[in-house]
Amino acid sequence: MVKQIESKAAFQEALDDAGDKLVVVDFSATWCGPCKMIKPFFHSLSEKYSNVVFLEVDVDDCQDVASECEVKCMPTFQFFKKGQKVGEFSGANKEKLEATINELV
């Protein structure tokens, strides 16, 4: 399951609630073509990796979160463990997304 993040407080709460689990955050926008292309794959990964927390942040709805996380383009995927960022890349690269999850989980 992918959790939609609606606010900075909800983002921080989701990171805190994850504990030791890997958190994968998809920063995207409704007008972004590559974001739309990778979204179904991102959701399928959330079914496959039940021990990983998947979050979605719409950069237009949560500009403060995107700004704090220094997101420059979409889609950007960031990876967190224990509240600390442990990885990041930009672009709709399915292979890299799954490989990074496997590397960090």
UniProtKB/Swiss-Prot annotation:
Highest taxon in the source lineage: Eukaryota
Q: N6-acetyllysine is carried by which residues?
A: K3, K39, K94
GO biological process per UniProt: positive regulation of DNA binding; response to radiation
Write down the Pfam families for this protein, in alphabetical order. Answer: Thioredoxin
**Disulfide bridges in this chain:** C32-C35
Is the keyword Transport assigned to this protein? yes
Q: Which sequence positions carry the modification called N6-succinyllysine?
A: K8, K94
Gene3D superfamilies recorded: Glutaredoxin
Q: Which residues form the active site?
A: C32 (nucleophile), C35 (nucleophile)
Which positions fall inside the Thioredoxin domain? 3-105
Q: Where in the cell is it found?
A: Nucleus; Cytoplasm; Secreted
The role this protein plays is: Participates in various redox reactions through the reversible oxidation of its active center dithiol to a disulfide and catalyzes dithiol-disulfide exchange reactions. Plays a role in the reversible S-nitrosylation of cysteine residues in target proteins, and thereby contributes to the response to intracellular nitric oxide. Nitrosylates the active site Cys of CASP3 in response to nitric oxide (NO), and thereby inhibits caspase-3 activity.
Similarity section: Belongs to the thioredoxin family.
What protein name does the entry list? Thioredoxin
